[in-house]
């Protein structure tokens, strides 16, 4: 697609250089059986699973723009799914969303929902990765926090999230795909800041 759009390999590589930096330094060639560079999706699924393949395809870039295929990046998506699953073994006590992650939870619900509607799947997934990192930074997740993560991740990794939904105590008949989408509160999407004025009396000259 890039070769057709830019007319030459040199022009296509320059375009990717501007957009992706070092990623674009790999030679750009068409996928062809004769060149032996065709990616077999079945092999990727066999190695990493269908959810990882699905997640990577939606994370690799905007649907309306071409992006280089990076097999190495698939492993990164697989590690992300592993981290989400591992949160089920790191549940912490507490009801609902904890104060330290509440704002990010509501921001993520809002952004993922909006991005799905506009087909910006890559930025929705990036937001989920940010949230998962924050949960790890805060020692894990409450059940409510992880349930929300699982719901938001379901469109991108349906098989794993359905299993994880059951692991969190939901019945097999309570299919996650038909469960109500999480709701956010606009007021809680805004970072709360407190300004504290500190006066050092020794520096005040009267």
Question: What are these regions, as identified by a protein language model?
Answer:
Residues 1-4, 9, 173-180:
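Short, positively charged
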Residues 2-6, 13-50, 64-75, 187-190:
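Conserved phosphate-binding loops in nucleotide/dinucleotide-binding enzymes
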Residues 42-203:
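Helix-rich, typically C-terminal accessory recognition domains appended to large enzymatic cores
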């Amino acid at each position: 697609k890039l070769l057709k759009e830019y007319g030459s390999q040199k022009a296509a590589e320059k375009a990717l250089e501007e957009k992706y930096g070092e990623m674009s330094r790999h030679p750009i060639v068409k996928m062809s059986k004769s060149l032996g560079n065709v990616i077999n999706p079945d092999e990727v699924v066999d190695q990493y699973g269908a959810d990882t393949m699905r997640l990577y395809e939606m994370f690799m870039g905007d649907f309306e723009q071409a992006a280089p295929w990076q097999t190495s990046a698939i492993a990164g998506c697989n590690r992300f799914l592993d981290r989400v699953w591992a949160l089920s073994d790191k549940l912490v006590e507490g009801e609902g969303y904890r104060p330290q992650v509440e704002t990010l939870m509501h921001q993520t619900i809002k952004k993922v929902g909006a991005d799905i509607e506009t087909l910006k799947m890559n930025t929705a997934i990036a937001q989920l990765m940010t949230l998962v990192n924050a949960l790890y930074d805060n020692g894990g997740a409450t059940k409510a926090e992880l349930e929300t993560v699982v719901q938001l991740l379901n469109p991108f990794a349906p098989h794993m999230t359905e299993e994880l939904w059951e692991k969190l105590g939901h019945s097999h008949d309570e299919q996650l795909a038909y469960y109500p989408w999480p709701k956010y509160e606009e007021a809680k999407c805004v970072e709360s800041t407190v300004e504290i004025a500190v006066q050092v009396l020794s520096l005040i000259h009267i």
